[in-house]
Amino acid sequence: RQGLFDHPYQIDLKETDKEVNCAENQLVALQASKESLVLLKNQDAVLPLDVNKISKIAVCGPNADEEAYALTHYGPLAVEVTTVLEGIRNKVKPGTDVLFTKGCDLVDANWPESELIRYPLTAEEQSEIDKAVENAKKSDVTVVVLGGSNRTCGENKSRSSLDLPGRQLDLL
């Protein structure tokens, strides 16, 4: 019970965040996340990754080292988030090389117009993608973290395309 209607203009948002983000709710959220994942294809049984067989792992993508993509305006914002890059660094065995390159920004300089009109890659964009590809070639496995953000998804964020925004398809 949050008492929203007892004193509707005197809410302590920090206390509300603590209540919503309690240990019990964290466990429920974790279980819901586990149960909502669907693996469509596991070619050559690559998953789950075996940390003992990986000496070098490439991580790329605009959301790989980004916390904000995991948060929404529909829940508590004062929560601790582990980025995919941090999670990988925490899980691999000591001595494993983790090569990170962003690869591209979430959206390109011409976005949102670039959803309708294809612009050529700039030299800087191509260079960043090339770095990510080189890291992938040198690695045992590559994790690519793509998607949207509150800038590209949400209320009042209508888009003309369901494709990944920016240069993410070029990176992939």
What are these regions (language model features)?
Residues 5, 13-172:
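C-terminal non-catalytic regions of proteins with extracellular/luminal or membrane-system context
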